[in-house]
Amino acid sequence: MDDELEALVIGEKQLDRKLVADILSPYVRLDRNTRNISPMEAWLGLGTDLKILVYLVARKAMMLLRFGLEAERATANEIADDTNLKLDAVNRLLRNMYAEGLLERSKGRRYFVRDDALDRVWEKIGQQKV
């Protein structure tokens, strides 16, 4: 009975690390020393919305791997700066993805991908051809 209940729990402990790796592996590499997210060639083929999602999932992975980031969450300015995307587009897409339930927003308007939304992120990225 306890195992069945534990299967309902969402959190870092239950996070599907393979799914996180599957989402990220075609698009980015993570540098532990510099704490940078390095895009690969396939990154260029992603739409702006998917770049934001991959970036935020990469931050989630860096927290799981204990890279020493202060937080998984990122502001629109941080996302725009780190990804070279236009701030207006980032703000608009963050609001849309928050409304869709893909993202959560904390104090200070810092966004992160919900653990329970990773499957939907995978589906959205899967609809894009690599």
Which residues does each PLM region occupy?
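A short alpha-helical element within helix-turn-helix/winged-helix DNA-binding domains
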Residues: 71-81
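Minor-groove-contacting beta-hairpin "wing" of winged helix-turn-helix DNA-binding domains
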Residues: 73, 109-115
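Short amphipathic alpha-helical interaction segments
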Residues: 81-99
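Short, well-structured alpha-helical interface segments that form or flank functional binding sites
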Residues: 47-51, 74, 88-92
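A short, conserved structural fragment
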Residues: 98-108
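Long, low-complexity, charged/polar intrinsically disordered regions in eukaryotic proteins
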Residues: 1-44
